[in-house]
Amino acid sequence: MKQAVIVDCIRTPMGRSKAGVFRNVRAETLSAELMKGLLLRNPQLDPNLIEDVIWGCVQQTLEQGFNIARNASLLAGIPKTAGAVTVNRLCGSSMDAIHQAARAIMTGMGDTFIIGGVEHMGHVPMSHGVDFHPGLANKVAKASGMMGLTAEMLGKLHGITREQQDAFAVRSHQRAYAATVEGRFAKEIYGIEGHDANGALIKVLQDEVIRPETTMESLAALRPVFDPVNGTVTAGTSSALSDGASAMLIMEESKARALGLPIRARIRSMAVAGCDAAIMGYGPVPATQKALARAGITVADLDVIELNEAFAAQSLPCVKDLGLADVVDDKINLNGGAIALGHPLGCSGARISTTLINLMEDKDATLGLATMCIGLGQGIATVFERV
């Protein structure tokens, strides 16, 4: 079977969704700039070789509608002979884009793909136009479409305390801030033009969402936001609202080598899995178990792990049931996660994979896992191997 490899991976800085640096920048522009960036960074690649552009996006309406993958690829100047498709697996959309490209390569249906994802949550809110079928309440718990309440449920089932959630959130901000100050995000962030607080045009080079001042005391002062009476999940222990995009150049290994392109990682295995929609945040557990089995490895073989931090109350049960509680500080989200950086829905799968690959390089690691939960009860996971 042919091998799918990551040649390059980049992301935008994460902009705050409310009056942030990308308030005047459209989702198509964020996407197109990354597509152009991949080509500029890899001049050996003839753009005419691109088979398809596969782009994740959840709210496919307004500026993100009418196949944003094609709109962005045309804006980027990618040859019109390349295809383009927008995919939606909710939070796992751009990781699904990775999987779609990998499967195509493995089965001989192309050897060069640009993949990624975007979500401008400031321009297109998560709930915009959503209208659940009334009959869905006969199949799943009524609150299954309310992500915060599913996190509350999962946290309660696993005995996750408010203090544990707050500590996990503080860790996320501290690590993301340290990664910024120490330049550990520099290789993955591709600068994008935006606007400062005064409206001046600037080149944005750092994430805007991180709050280094976050402490246990400041989080303790926040009130539960989803279940005000009995809940423990606050805005501070939930993924931040942010705007951003991520992108990868994925190729068939021998083709990349023939062109003299770098091989940053190989896709070792992939998996998706379902779980009860009422505890959708548990999805990484069965998805990871599948991916590890397909790779022929165990969780102990993993050197670095990126687990998307939708909520602290969701992440901690996954850490526990995957047998990772004792290695959190050694292996998991070493540069912080979505609580600090935000979770632009369609962007996050390729974003955490990009962060993972850079961490693997920094630590000279061999095996890494990127995994995330998905609304309405799914999980998705990818095992990467440096070669």
Curated annotation (Swiss-Prot):
Keyword Transferase listed: yes
Q: Name one GO cellular component term.
A: cytoplasm
Q: Is Lipid metabolism among the key words of this record?
A: yes
Do you know which InterPro entries this protein is assigned to? FadA, Thiolase, Thiolase-like, Thiolase-like_sf_Thiolase, Thiolase_acyl_enz_int_AS, Thiolase_AS, Thiolase_C, Thiolase_CS
What Gene3D superfamilies has UniProt attached to this entry? Answer: 3.40.47.10
Q: Which GO terms describe its biological process?
A: fatty acid beta-oxidation; phenylacetate catabolic process
Catalysed reaction(s) here are:
an acyl-CoA + acetyl-CoA = a 3-oxoacyl-CoA + CoA
Q: Where is the active site?
A: C91, H343, C373
Per its UniProt record, what PROSITE patterns does this chain match? THIOLASE_1, THIOLASE_2, THIOLASE_3
Named in its record, the pathway it takes part in is: Lipid metabolism; fatty acid beta-oxidation
The EC number on file is 2.3.1.16
UniProt feature coiled coil, ranges = none
The cross-references to CDD domains, in alphabetical order and at most eight, read:
thiolase
HAMAP family under this entry? FadA
Note the subunit structure.
Heterotetramer of two alpha chains (FadB) and two beta chains (FadA).
- Family statement: Belongs to the thiolase-like superfamily. Thiolase family.
Its annotated function is as follows: Catalyzes the final step of fatty acid oxidation in which acetyl-CoA is released and the CoA ester of a fatty acid two carbons shorter is formed.
User: Under what name is this protein listed?
Assistant: 3-ketoacyl-CoA thiolase
- Name the gene that codes for it: fadA
